Amino acid sequence: MSRTKSVQDYIRTIVDFPHEGILFRDVTTLFADPRGFRIAIDQMLHPYAGERIDKVVGLEARGFILGGAIAHQLSVGFVPIRKKGKLPGTTISQDYKLEYGEAIVEIHDDAIQPGEKILLVDDLLATGGTAAAGIKLVERLGGEIVSCAFIIDLPDLGGRKVLESMGMDVHALCAFDGL
């Protein structure tokens, strides 16, 4: 008797990428499989059944793939948060810390209206830096984050704790220990 595959079964692990000692969790294999992708989107939507969500915000880059599909299923708009200099028009920006240095993400200054309920999505929650920056951008525009949804949580890197300390509801479809 065969068991039903879980989301985790569709995710490929690549050893020593991008650096030695890293186990890279590759979601492109999940995205490439129609059944796996459908399972992931359906499971990411499940916690929000009946909840008001006005827009989905996706973090660059794989959050765009998930966010677009989820927004379509919810019949709501999609808003990208991108690296600095990638969005045309007027934006606001937020810096955040990386392992070595800092980065900046941006959102259009008219993308979120005050009081809108937002679902923030990305493929991976590691340290929480990018997601925290995205949350700050949405809140600066007056939006309210309903929840943050991810495919993968890397709990050893502490991102969930960072987001929960900001008062966020966090959902992930699976977790992998280690780096």
Curated annotation (Swiss-Prot):
It catalyses: AMP + diphosphate = 5-phospho-alpha-D-ribose 1-diphosphate + adenine. Catalyzes a salvage reaction resulting in the formation of AMP, that is energically less costly than de novo synthesis. The keyword Coiled coil does not apply. This is Adenine phosphoribosyltransferase. The lineage of its organism: Bacteria, Pseudomonadati, Pseudomonadota, Alphaproteobacteria, Rhodobacterales. One of its GO terms (biological process) is purine ribonucleoside salvage. Keywords: Cytoplasm, Glycosyltransferase, Purine salvage, Transferase. Belongs to the purine/pyrimidine phosphoribosyltransferase family. Pathway: Purine metabolism; AMP biosynthesis via salvage pathway; AMP from adenine: step 1/1. It holds the Pfam family Pribosyltran. One of its GO terms (cellular component) is cytoplasm. It comes from Ruegeria pomeroyi (strain ATCC 700808 / DSM 15171 / DSS-3) (Silicibacter pomeroyi). The keyword Cytoplasm applies. GO terms for molecular function: adenine binding; adenine phosphoribosyltransferase activity; AMP binding. NCBIfam families: apt, PRK02304.1-3, PRK02304.1-5. It comes from the Bacteria. InterPro entries: Ade_phspho_trans, PRibTrfase_dom, PRTase-like, UPRTase/APRTase. PROSITE patterns: PUR_PYR_PR_TRANSFER.
